[in-house]
Amino acid sequence: MDSIYPLLRECLRGTTPPLVVLPANPVEAQRLHHHFVGKPAPGSALIMTTSGTTGTPKGARLSAATLRASIDSTHTALGGPGRWLLAVPAHHIIGMQVLLRSLHTGYPPVTMPIDDGFQLAALPDAITELLEGHHTQPQPQSQPQTQSQSQPQRRHYASLVPNQLDTLYQDLHSSRPDTRRTAEKALHACAQLDAILSGGAPLPQHIDDYLTAAGLTIVRGYGSSEVAGGVLFDGRPGPATQILSLIHI
């Protein structure tokens, strides 16, 4: 993962040719690449493959300015920049933005192995590493910083898709004591995060309600690959989002 960080830094600066992001699986990568047509338009920094939920996957062109605006908007909506846990595939925008947010703010992410699928039992150790690990300081700003700016309170986040939260919910209600114990440990670990950003699909309300009552801070994001991630957070527009009313048009 470290090998791609220099390329991603250049993407955020807009100083590199467009970086095309494809899955590590060569068969899947070739299948998706087959759908790419033409050359990226000028100003492209990153080409992300859409999920294909509503049709054939395609390459979404994202500029460096769009990526940075999404990063700042997300962190503002969550309460400030922080350190992130990567527990979703990085070839989707939800995972890629975890890496980009981390690079943009200077906090190295913690990567949770998911090659064999999401394992709830691995979540507590990953979150412990997230909470206890050292972080690099953000790059110095062009203007003098106040004490509160130069030593920001570290926050901790994770991006999880609804299926992962559903796994937690289902295992908490399992008839198997060992499964419940594993889920309870994961729940306790998740409760130590400042926020869990859920996106990629709708989160059932009963799961949101249950996990929130159990101590988790869940922020439901809504967006797409084409807009570099979330534009609404818990139904409210992020700072980089403008709502256009078409009622009178």
PLM region spans:
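Carrier-protein-dependent adenylate-forming modules in NRPS/ANL systems
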Residues: M1-G38
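Hydrophobic alpha-helical segments in the ANL/AMP-binding
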Residues: D2-G14, T74-H75, I93-T105
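Conserved small/polar residues in nucleotide/adenosyl-binding loops
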Residues: T50, I247-I249
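AMP-binding/adenylate-forming
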Residues: A64-A69, R83-T167, V219
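Gly/Ser/Thr-rich phosphate-binding loop
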Residues: D171-D234
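Conserved beta-loop-beta connector loops within the AMP-binding
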Residues: A240-I247
